[in-house]
Amino acid sequence: MIALIQRVSRASVVVDNQTIGAIDKGLLVLLGVEQQDTREKMEKLATKVMSYRVFSDENGKMNLNLEQVGGSLLVVSQFTLAADTGRGLRPSFSGAGTPDQALALYEEFVAFCRAKGVTTETGQFGADMQVSLVNDGPVTFNLQV
């Protein structure tokens, strides 16, 4: 399971000209599901995302996590993160989770974060989305479990 996280001052998702999810300070999470992913991996990754220290403390050091800064999550499914780009000029998605598996783990990821008290907005699974963000830093990390 892959989470590409970006520290943002704001981010939003639009589907069919309607904003369906938006946050101010927090993390935009692009979430990719691979074939071998499980609920256990999802919980481990969600915990890491929420606990990862990517926000600056009073000394400018990345030492604070999402909860410590009162931040929110915007979680967007992105199967292209599971692409194999090692050969040729066209990505292979053979390692990506099935749509049913990915939807289930995506929904469980969101529910897990919300259950931990984190304000969590979402995109729309499988939709053509326009994602806008102001990357603060820029700060971007590729987390995998």
UniProtKB/Swiss-Prot annotation:
GO molecular function, one term: tRNA binding
Record localization: Cytoplasm
A Pfam family the protein falls into: Tyr_Deacylase
Gene Ontology, cellular component aspect: cytoplasm
Presence of the UniProt keyword Secreted in the record: no
Major localisation: cytoplasm
Disulfide bonds: none
Gene Ontology biological process terms from the UniProt entry: D-amino acid catabolic process
Residue interval(s) of motif Gly-cisPro motif, important for rejection of L-amino acids: 137-138
EC number: 3.1.1.96
Catalytic reactions of this protein: glycyl-tRNA(Ala) + H2O = tRNA(Ala) + glycine + H(+); a D-aminoacyl-tRNA + H2O = a tRNA + a D-alpha-amino acid + H(+)
Family: Belongs to the DTD family.
Name of this protein: D-aminoacyl-tRNA deacylase
Gene behind the chain: dtd
